[in-house]
Amino acid sequence: MLSSVCVWSFRGRQGTGKQQPQPVPTPQPPESSPPPLPPPQQQQCSQPGTAASPAGAPLSCGPGGRRAEPCPGLPAVAMGRHGGGGGDSGKIVINVGGVRHETYRSTLRTLPGTRLAGLTEPEAAARFDYDPGTDEFFFDRHPGVFAYVLNYYRTGKLHCPADVCGPLFEEELGFWGIDETDVEACCWMTYRQHRDAEEALDSFEAPDSSANANANAGGAHDAGLDDEAGAGGGGLDGAGGELKRLCFQDAGGGAGGPAGGAGGAGGTWWRRWQPRVWALFEDPYSSRAARYVAFASLFFILISITTFCLETHEGFIHISNKTVTQASPIPGAPPENITNVEVETEPFLTYVEGVCVVWFTFEFLMRVTFCPDKVEFLKSSLNIIDCVAILPFYLEVGLSGLSSKAAKDVLGFLRVVRFVRILRIFKLTRHFVGLRVLGHTLRASTNEFLLLIIFLALGVLIFATMIYYAERIGADPDDILGSNHTYFKNIPIGFWWAVVTMTTLGYGDMYPKTWSGMLVGALCALAGVLTIAMPVPVIVNNFGMYYSLAMAKQKLPKKKNKHIPRPPQPGSPNYCKPDPPPPPPPHPHHGSGGISPPPPITPPSMGVNVAGAYPPGPHTHPGLLRGGAGGLGIMGLPPLPAPGEPCPLAQEEVIETNRADPRPNGDPAAAALAHEDCPAIDQPAMSPEDKSPITPGSRGRYSRDRACFLVTDYAPSPDGSIRKGYEKSRSLSSIVGLSGVSLRLAPLATPPGSPRATRRAPPTLPSIL
């Protein structure tokens, strides 16, 4: 049984200057016609903007009176010469973002299986947003990109616009169902360069914001691990924190996240603190405490490198002679005294290095203990450098007390391995974005570096050979090796000279002495300038692009109140109409003379004051008749219409959409609606009148931009049991090609067959509707 409830809600997509269309009375069926439809379905046909179709069936207009669709339960009619697919004209009109495009149906059939090819099918008017008044299909997409897409159908060549970002063009291609590999070669680099840059800059981002939010949710404020940025960007404590945790699906503990809030049920110490400690040592931008840890690590890195350099200065080196008594190799001879020269550094430098190693050891153990993936941790080059730089110090301390020859050999080797400590300088890449940009630039410019090496190798080989034979011209016949008049005694020595000359260094240790050798040297210098000048600008451009994007991401303000779009609704450009629902079964408590649905109900989560429309009953939830914050109601709204009266505003059906189907909206739309279950997160302040975002200049249109929608969730159980939960109707479960999510309603707890309104159990948390 369908139960209709009209609730007021703000529809932001309606224009402020549009006048609501006047309701048109529903045409009455003749006396010989079948029994009238139930009031809910008649009410659907009595919407504003209703007009009669050529076949006499009323068409209900969507919000704003823009789109017309057949009323559910009535036979479909031909929707114009283009929309119905039965017209004699071969042209079709497509309105994309307000720009009308006209083409032939045969043009759209050139790429079968795409979205535009689906417009030529007979059922296109029922699947897409078709307006019979203007005889066109409407898509709310980028009109400039669509011009290139339509030209691809006409010419068979897909070009990329230069004034559109690559990811946007990729998103539009995915929406229209076109493969990106069809882009022409002349536009491929323009199409790919932005995506390549973003892929390379993914590592510049801080750890996952959701993980940071989960880490702060469980009491990071109490632990002193959050700051003003974290509290504004990802903290979940405070008002509505529990609701946000549920929307983040964090109540039971996510992967790598805390099991719950501080002291939450079922939470463990490890699941609460593991992500926080990991972010404390890994991400310097996660909290104020993480910044302090990063500064401490940076300080010890600089001290360790300074100590390493001072150990080689003669002012910190002490040379001492130690006499060691050793047995004589000659039998019966007295022991021999052997004097050994030992080099020792200042003791305080050793102590300073020991303090630095203790800090690095503590940091390394904390990171390896609390890392989420130890295998990936051990694969990191920076972590390997940490381990290799720490081990020699402990081995040297442990072997310093031994006097055996093997121990001394190991100590000598460890002193040589001390140079590994200088590699700690690469740990600075965690704290400076410019160093990370440089590393990514070198990796992204690998092909250019290989090309540069090949050019240099060819030039070195050619000019080293030429300088060797050029210096032999005019040489003394008695000087076979040419050591008396030239430095180039062989070709391998000429390799060094060619490298120094081609890179324009010119050390001066080797130079030609003959006129022929000087000519070869001049050609070598010119070739080196041209060889290096070709690939270097590409490397510089890569660095400039990566660095500018990295700086832009750092300076980008945090979106604390990001607007999350709603699922496609009737009248939306991406809305696809469902199949007409079947007639509802007769109510068991009514006679055969007619079908009377139960009185409309309003869930308490909807927040609608119905005290003026329905008297209290035994099955009416008290929250329905109680206004204000206590009853979650909204005072001051007009009462709901009585059953059978036409809805004064445009209807809106609550449907459950298929998120997995990417055909109508594509992956970008599914990603945009990923958190639609929780629209209260990161949204602007809501108006207490209609639960709509408050924006400057929007208060004046609240009284005009309202709409109602139908809640079709009452279906009595045939076995007489009490139904709990929300069940979708069969007619809505077969909808294909929609994206979005279903609305979360409070559980039902009403025996079937009750003549009163369905009672809805009070929710444990405030409704997010």
From Swiss-Prot:
The text of the family note is: Belongs to the potassium channel family. C (Shaw) (TC 1.A.1.2) subfamily. Kv3.3/KCNC3 sub-subfamily.
| Tissue expression notes | Detected on Purkinje cells in the dentate, interposed and medial nucleus in cerebellum. Detected in brainstem. Detected at calyces of Held in the auditory brain stem (at protein level). Isoform KV3.3B is highly enriched in the brain, particularly in the cerebellum, where its expression is confined to Purkinje cells and deep cerebellar nuclei. Isoform KV3.3A is not expressed in cerebellum.
* Modification comment: N-glycosylated.
Q: Where does the record say this protein resides?
A: Cell membrane; Presynaptic cell membrane; Perikaryon; Cell projection, Axon
List residues binding K(+). 504-507
Entries under Gene3D superfamilies matching the protein: 1.10.287.70, Potassium Channel Kv1.1, Chain A, Voltage-gated potassium channels. Chain C
User: Cellular component per GO?
Assistant: axolemma; axon terminus; calyx of Held; cell cortex; cytoskeleton; dendrite; dendrite membrane; dendritic spine membrane
Catalysed transformations (reactions): K(+)(in) = K(+)(out)
- Gene from which the chain derives: Kcnc3
Q: What InterPro entries does the record point to?
A: BTB/POZ_dom, Ion_trans_dom, K_chnl_volt-dep_Kv, K_chnl_volt-dep_Kv3, K_chnl_volt-dep_Kv3.3, SKP1/BTB/POZ_sf, T1-type_BTB, VG_K_chnl
- Classification via SUPFAM superfamilies: POZ domain (SSF54695), Voltage-gated potassium channels (SSF81324)
What membrane topology does the UniProt entry give? Answer: Multi-pass membrane protein
Q: What is the protein name given in its UniProt record?
A: Voltage-gated potassium channel KCNC3
Q: What keywords does the record list, in alphabetical order?
A: Cell membrane, Cell projection, Cytoplasm, Cytoskeleton, Glycoprotein, Ion channel, Ion transport, Membrane, Metal-binding, Methylation, Phosphoprotein, Postsynaptic cell membrane, Potassium, Potassium channel, Potassium transport, Synapse, Transmembrane, Transmembrane helix, Transport, Voltage-gated channel, Zinc
Cytoplasmic face: residue ranges? 1-291, 372-380, 436-448, 541-769
Q: Where is the composition biased (Pro residues)?
A: 22-41
- TM helices/strands, residue ranges: 292-310, 352-371, 381-399, 413-435, 449-470, 519-540
